[in-house]
Structure formats: C-alpha cells, structure tokens
C-alpha cells in the first residue's frame, strides 16, 4: 500500500491518528456526537487506527479507518436482501440518485461532477448489498459529497414522484393506440443486455438452484422477465424496510477530522431516526440430501453452430465468508486445482478433450460458492465431466497437491493482500470489511488478514488443502451439476412471449386506460427533456476556486550511485514490499530497432530464462 508515511521517522507513527481529534483520545464506551465507540484497534495490515461506532439513537454502525491518506472516502451501505427477481435493489440504487429533499434536481451527481474534485463517485448493487462510495482529496468537497449521498439514500424523491421508478425501472410505452405496447426503462434495458450473455444466465441458474429458499436464489439486479412486476407500492415499502439507519453500515476512510464527520452525520441525518428492533437477516439455505442436477438452454443466433457451445458447471456451497481462513483456502484451491497452468483438474479435463476453457471461481457470501466450469463443451460430456472432476479431487485428497505450485500461489496471494494495488485504498477497505461486517458484525476480521494467512501457509506442511477438498467438495451434498446448452430460436420465442403478453394486456384495456398510458409516456418524455430550474441547481454545493489548495505534494527522493548506476530511492509505507523499476536509455538504439524494443518489453516475464522454465517462474 502506498501511503505517505515515512518509515524512518518515529514521529510518523502518530500520523495514523490524524483522522481523530488531536485534543481528544477516543476511548471505547464513551459517546462522541451521538456515537458510542464500541471498539478501537490499530490494524497493522493496513497501517491504520480503526474505530467502530454505533449510533445510539438510530442504530447505525460506523467504521472509521483513520490514517494520513488525503484521499478520503465516505461510503454508506445497506443490507438489501431481494425477495423476488423484480430487481428492486438495483432499481433503488438508480432511483435514489434522481433527486432528494435537499437537492431536488433530476440527477444531482451529474451536476456535482461539474463542480467537484471527486476521485471516485459511484453506487453498486451486489447479491445482498447496495453501497454508495464517494472519495475526494478536498475537505470541503468531501463533506459536500457526503451530504448529497446521505440525502439521496434517506430522503429520495421516489415517494412523491412515480416517474423516477418509471424511468429507472420500467414503464409501459405507447405513442399512439395503433402502435404496439412495449416495456422500457433504464434497468430493464440494462438487464436485457446482461442476460444476452450465457455466462450471466448460467450464474442466475446456479444461484436459483443452490438457494431455492432464501434471498440468494433471487436476482438482485432484476431478471428482464420479472422486472415489469415491480409496483410503486412495493418499491416504496422496500425503501422503508431496508434504507433505515438501523440497517446501514457507514465507512469513513482517510485523514478527515473524525469529530467533524460524526457531528455532521449525527446532526444532519441520524438524529432524526429511532433504532428498529428487528434486524435484517438472511436465513441460511438448508443443505441438500443429494447433489442436484439441472439443465437449461440459452439462445444462439440461427445458423450459428451449437456443437462445442455447452457450459458444464459443478458448484458447491462451502462454508461461510465469516471464516476468513477457509475463504483463503478456497482462493488457493481455485488456483491449485484448476486455474494454474499445471493444475491437475485442468490437465485432466484437457486430456479428456472436454471443452476448451476451464475455470474455477470462489464467491465469498454468507454461504460461499466454489464453482468449476467448462465452456465450449457438449451435453454428452456431462457424465464424463463429473466423473473426471470427482476422480481428480479424490486423487488430490489422497496424494496432495504439488507443494512448489501451492507455495507460489500462496506467495502471490500474500503479495496481493499486502500490496492492495488500488488508487482507492478506502474502496479496498470497503470490499475487505463488508462480508464479515454484514454477517458477523466484525469488520476488523476482513482487514486483519495476517492471522488467516498464517493458517493457510500451514498447507505447505499439513493436509489443510486436502482436508478442505474432502469436507467441502467430496463429502458435500449441497452441490449442483448445471448444464447450459444452446438452442436455436429461443430468443425469438422469448420475444414472442413478451409481445403476446403485452398484446393481450393492451387488448384488455379500455380506451381511457390506453389514453392514460399515452399521457404517461408523454409526461415521462417531457420530464426527461425538462431542464432543472436555477433554484434547484443552486441547491447543489459547488467548489469555488478559493476552495482548491495551491500546495503541491512533494516526495523527497534520495539520490545515490551504485556500480556507476544512478539510483533514486523513496521511503514509503509499502507493507514490506520493495518496488524496483529499471530504466534503460535507448537514445543510441537505431530507429528501425525501436519496435523490437517494445516487443522485447512485452515478452520479458512471459518466457523461460537460462536458469528457470516459464512454469518455474510462474510458480515463484
């Protein structure tokens, strides 16, 4: 991680507290601006002081990751468990960004961008989470963005303006009584595009079959065939249920003044709410008595080949995301069993001639999924695929995996964890904390990766990996063999069914009802084309030139010479990783050889050397 802390300055150890008031040492059990400090701990893995609060009145949870990083991040997330395939979590993510009580413009963030120095501005929907992260290096901008985001999620205009759901979710569109009735909407059209991919259809079917009785069996993004079932009444009730501070998880990252952050959030928003007694929980899916099998088809264009176009996928529900060591173990197994070039399952399937692309993925969730998928296969390969996978897993359980390969994979995992290669360190902390925070009320577990990593390193001298294969794969009935094969004409059938559904509905409507839909179509178009009023635009906080600092951050470089080669050195917190760049002066290289220098640069690292094969380099 590239922070600006100097390792050789003892005083820099105090910088980790820069997000806190220098006049006040935060103490667990004490109350600060309506927030009780629950836990305070220095997390060496991210070189930051982390403070977990609970807002006494509203029940909101808040984690401050305090360090000297000026790239401050604010995020508010909600546990949003879908109750159907209508796409309500996804549509709500869009909808709350269409104006709010204090900022009544059609798209506050489009306006904000014109007067903001944000380094990140987005919103995302997952299987059980909707999250709203924003970052800025400017203090005033940071609080402006925080203000707009909080108002968006807690005071959206969706209650008074049904056109927001119509625009962002779905609506009937009818230009005249002679035209066909159609479905339109931002998310509706987006998800039609998403489900034009067979990979996404496969994922949808896997979750449907593995989790038939809980929220993970539903598509939080919305399935095109189901989105038009969403009503304004249900939409409002969803916001009331899930977008309450008691169900919120707020993350603050960086060097902003913590007292100021807490005071603002409490005063402007949370103090107006009372905590709910009922907590949003997703019940666990009961395990199966025997492995499931399912087969479906996906559309392909007429005339395109169907041979070698089938997906075969074995899926296992394996433990929980709250078990950090187990999650790391399966990250290693995904590589060691399948994804590595010399992985035994990859080689066995290649030798059998099943498919042309095999991939393992591990999805961290309340109940994790380990997936082995072969593309470009055929339906008749199903039984051989299953037989080869289980035979190979049995061999691995009995004889183990190649230790040098496993060591290389673990070393790479450790490097990636320590490096945290992202310009948005706050966003990285968000993704690290959310699973254990949501499902075990412990965000620290996601940040403190050294302990589970040490457990996984034991795989080099123990049967840790082999035991995981036995317990969670070979002896696991909560599993699914999914076959997804191509079908000519399926897309035409889907479109015909949708058109017939719309036509039947249209013929059932009275002339007055048709007039109402046409009026709604016109009004929505007028709304989309109407400019915001100057009064509404004036509510959006903008930076002025005087708000922008003129200081330039300076990185002092130590210059020295080693073996007649100039060396530039900079001390920084890099989590024990040394970064070295070698630069070669090409001024004497003939012009005609310049393209070959570029080719050489592309090849280096992808070829063997005098002392190591490419495979050995990859493992090390």
Residue ranges with predicted function:
Residues 2-10:
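Sec-dependent signal peptide recognition
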Residues 24-29, 249-308, 399, 502-506, ...:
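An aromatic/glycine/proline-enriched structural segment found at the starts
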């Amino acid at each position: 991680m590239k922070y600006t802390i100097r390792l050789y300055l003892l005083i820099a150890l105090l910088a980790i507290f820069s997000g806190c008031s220098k006049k006040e040492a935060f103490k667990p059990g004490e109350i600060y601006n309506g927030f009780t400090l629950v836990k305070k701990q220095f997390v060496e893995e991210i070189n930051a002081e982390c403070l977990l609060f609970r807002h006494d009145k509203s029940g909101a949870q808040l984690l401050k990751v305090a360090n000297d990083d000026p790239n401050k991040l604010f995020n508010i997330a909600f546990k949003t468990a879908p109750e159907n395939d209508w796409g309500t979590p996804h549509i709500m993510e869009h909808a709350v960004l269409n104006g709010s009580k204090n900022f009544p413009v059609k798209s506050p963030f489009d306006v904000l961008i014109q007067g903001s120095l944000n380094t990140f501005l987005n919103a995302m929907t997952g299987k059980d989470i909707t999250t709203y992260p924003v970052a800025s290096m400017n203090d005033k901008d940071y609080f402006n963005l925080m203000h707009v985001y909080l108002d968006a999620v807690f005071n959206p205009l969706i209650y008074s303006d049904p056109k927001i759901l119509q625009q962002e979710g779905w609506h009937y569109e009818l230009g005249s009584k002679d035209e066909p009735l159609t479905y339109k909407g931002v998310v509706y059209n987006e998800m039609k595009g998403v489900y034009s991919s067979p990979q996404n259809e496969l994922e949808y079917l896997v979750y449907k079959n593995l989790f038939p009785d809980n929220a993970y069996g539903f598509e939080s993004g919305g399935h095109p065939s189901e989105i038009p079932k969403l009503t304004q009444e249900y939409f409002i009730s969803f916001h009331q249920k899930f977008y309450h501070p008691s169900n919120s998880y707020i993350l603050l990252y960086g060097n902003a003044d913590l007292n100021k952050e807490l005071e603002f959030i409490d005063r402007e928003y949370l103090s107006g709410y009372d905590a709910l007694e009922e907590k949003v929980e997703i019940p666990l899916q009961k395990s199966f008595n025997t492995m499931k099998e399912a087969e479906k088809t996906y559309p392909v264009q007429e005339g395109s080949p169907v041979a070698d176009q089938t997906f075969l996928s074995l899926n296992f529900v394996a433990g929980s995301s709250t078990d950090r060591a187990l999650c790391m173990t399966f990250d290693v197994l995904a590589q060691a069993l399948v994804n590595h070039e010399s992985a035994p399952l990859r080689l066995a399937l290649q030798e059998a001639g099943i498919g042309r692309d095999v991939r393992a993925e591990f999805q961290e969730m309340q109940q994790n999924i380990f997936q082995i998928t072969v593309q470009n296969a055929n339906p008749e390969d199903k039984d051989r695929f299953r037989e080869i996978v289980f035979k190979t897993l049995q061999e691995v359980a009995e004889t183990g995996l190649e230790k040098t390969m496993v060591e290389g994979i673990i070393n790479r995992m450790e490097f990636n964890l320590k490096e945290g290669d992202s310009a948005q360190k706050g966003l990285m902390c968000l993704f690290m904390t959310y699973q254990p925070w949501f499902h075990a009320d412990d965000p620290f577990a996601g940040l403190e990766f050294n302990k589970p990593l040490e457990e996984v390193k034991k795989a080099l001298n123990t049967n840790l990996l082999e035991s995981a294969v036995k317990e969670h794969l070979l002896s696991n009935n909560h599993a699914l063999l999914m076959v997804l094969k191509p079908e000519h004409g399926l897309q035409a059938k889907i479109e015909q069914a949708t058109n017939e559904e719309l036509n039947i509905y249209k013929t059932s409507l009275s002339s007055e009802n048709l007039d109402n839909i046409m009026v709604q179509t016109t009004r929505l178009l007028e709304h989309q084309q109407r400019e915001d009023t100057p009064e509404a635009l004036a509510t959006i906080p903008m930076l002025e030139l005087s708000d922008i600092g003129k200081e330039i951050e300076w990185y002092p470089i130590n210059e020295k010479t080693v073996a007649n080669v100039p060396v530039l050195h900079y001390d920084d917190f890099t989590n024990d990783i040394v970064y070295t760049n070698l630069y070669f002066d090409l001024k004497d290289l003939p012009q005609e050889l310049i393209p070959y220098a570029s080719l050489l640069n592309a090849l280096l690292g992808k070829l063997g050397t005098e002392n190591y094969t490419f495979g050995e380099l990859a493992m090390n």
